[in-house]
Curated annotation (Swiss-Prot):
This is Thymidine phosphorylase. The enzymes which catalyze the reversible phosphorolysis of pyrimidine nucleosides are involved in the degradation of these compounds and in their utilization as carbon and energy sources, or in the rescue of pyrimidine bases for nucleotide synthesis. It comes from the Bacteria. It comes from Mycoplasma pneumoniae (strain ATCC 29342 / M129 / Subtype 1). GO terms for cellular component: cytosol. It holds the Pfam family Glycos_transf_3. Homodimer. Its EC number is 2.4.2.4. Keywords: Glycosyltransferase, Transferase. Belongs to the thymidine/pyrimidine-nucleoside phosphorylase family. The keyword Glycosyltransferase applies. Gene3D superfamilies: Nucleoside phosphorylase/phosphoribosyltransferase catalytic domain (3.40.1030.10), Pyrimidine nucleoside phosphorylase-like, C-terminal domain (3.90.1170.30), Transferase, Pyrimidine Nucleoside Phosphorylase, Chain C (1.20.970.10). One of its GO terms (molecular function) is thymidine phosphorylase activity.
């Protein structure tokens, strides 16, 4: 088979056969194709798209390019929740103890942050939680506490890593079929009864519009249907930072406040999204007959002590110390802190969640290339959230870092603030 013929065929809008797609994925996996040839193929897909059969074949071949993980969930309903990436998105960390308190089993593989999107693994490691476990060790965690969050295995869908790196440098990141196959190949490599995807759209997401997110969801549903897997997708707005924090240890601190019901320290939007996600999981998995019953069950669970106890057990089993979570000053103790004040009175908004994320990265909370080191204590607290009324001189943002915070940091943060009188 010849890669030039495949590129030409897709370039002219013709559908590829399963044999051709399998050959392409196998050739990428064994490194027998040049990067420029793979890139040309990706660009042809970007222009011409893929039909549902091609998409299924591509995803299946990507799954088969690596290992699949099979865990024993001990007859409990198993759920995998995935977010397509957002700013201030700490939902997975808060969700796991609630779901296990509701008697679900949650085996989750997560990634690190890159660019303006934060990573769950970085957030957990910032508070001493270990995430590097073998499948056997992960099963042991599941046996003891019905859950784990570990780093993405190098052996799962290795072809996706190659394709993603090339998409990132060839302006083909926003190809919906390629996004769908990338996300689903990793989700399908693990056995779970249900896959829930929190699909973000807006200024802080790669889907800039709700229409684009809906189209991507249809690709994902098509793949799941052909694999005979249960998939539920929730579309959620990422035009604002989620919650009151951007960072690593700082976002875990907001999760702690949430689980301990210290509501003044938690963003109202984060509280609302958590309720929506859990109630939709309860309804979709038939644990609740309707929304009213699901909401009641969610609140009864959250208001009890079980989620907090499950969380402490989770972090302890994964190598951190539960004692440090009882003293929040030990959990989050940045060396430097600087307020950013309102210049006038009025109604607050922010230019973009991405702008805030870039300030956070400049403080040390993120990475622009994979080799960048992260400052676990760096980040931003949104003391005032969008649409709140502020007075001149009010603290709007607080900046944190382990290194001195410069006037340039404060100026950059001030540029993200809009106050309308």
């Amino acid at each position: 088979m010849n890669i030039v013929n495949l590129i030409s065929k897709k370039q002219r809008g013709k559908a590829l056969t399963e044999t051709e797609i399998n050959w392409f994925v196998h050739s990428v996996n064994n490194k027998s194709l040049a990067d420029y040839q793979v890139s040309a193929f990706l660009m042809a897909v970007w222009f011409q798209g893929m039909n549902s059969k091609e998409l299924f074949c591509l995803t299946k071949a990507m799954v088969k390019s690596g290992e699949s993980l099979h865990f024993n969930h001990h007859s409990k309903l198993s759920v995998d929740k995935h977010s397509t990436g957002g700013i201030g998105d700490k939902v997975s960390i808060a969700l796991i103890p609630i779901l296990t308190a509701l008697d679900y089993s949650v085996a989750k593989l997560s990634g690190r942050g890159l660019g303006y999107t934060g990573g769950t693994i970085d957030k957990l490691e910032a508070v001493g939680v270990k995430t590097d476990f073998t499948p056997t060790e992960a099963q042991n965690l599941l046996d003891q506490n019905d859950c784990f969050i570990i780093g993405q295995s190098e052996g799962i869908a290795p072809v996706d890593k190659v394709l993603y790196a090339l998409r990132d440098t060839t302006a083909t990141v926003d190809s919906l079929p390629l996004i769908a196959s990338s996300v689903m190949s990793k989700k399908l490599a693990i056995n779970n009864d249900y896959i829930f995807i929190d699909l973000k759209y807006g200024k802080g997401a790669f889907c800039k519009t709700k229409t684009m997110a809906k189209e991507l969801a249809q690709y994902m549903y098509s793949i799941a249907k052909q694999f005979k897997r249960k998939l539920y997708i929730k579309l959620s707005d990422m035009n604002q930072v989620l919650g009151k924090t951007i960072g690593n240890a700082l976002e875990v601190l907001e999760v702690v406040h949430f689980l301990k019901r210290n509501w003044t320290e938690v963003g109202a939007d984060f509280i609302q999204l958590m309720e929506q996600i859990v109630t939709e999981i309860l309804i979709e998995t038939k644990r609740a007959p309707n929304k009213r019953a699901a909401v009641a069950l969610y609140h009864a669970t959250l208001e009890g002590e079980k989620p907090w106890q499950r969380f402490l057990k989770f972090i302890e089993l994964q190598g951190s110390s539960w004692e440090r979570f009882l003293d929040l000053k030990e959990l989050f103790n940045p060396q430097y802190k600087a307020p950013v004040l309102a210049s006038q009175s009025g109604t607050l908004s922010y230019t973009s969640p991405v702008d805030l994320a870039m300030v956070s990265i400049s403080l040390g909370a993120g990475r622009m290339v994979k080799t960048d080191l992260i400052d676990p204590m760096a980040g931003i607290k949104l003391v005032k959230q969008a649409n709140e009324v502020v007075k001149a001189g009010d603290t709007v943002l607080e900046l944190y870092s382990s290194k001195p915070i410069t006037p340039a940091h404060i100026e950059a943060a001030q540029h993200t603030i809009i106050i309308k009188q």
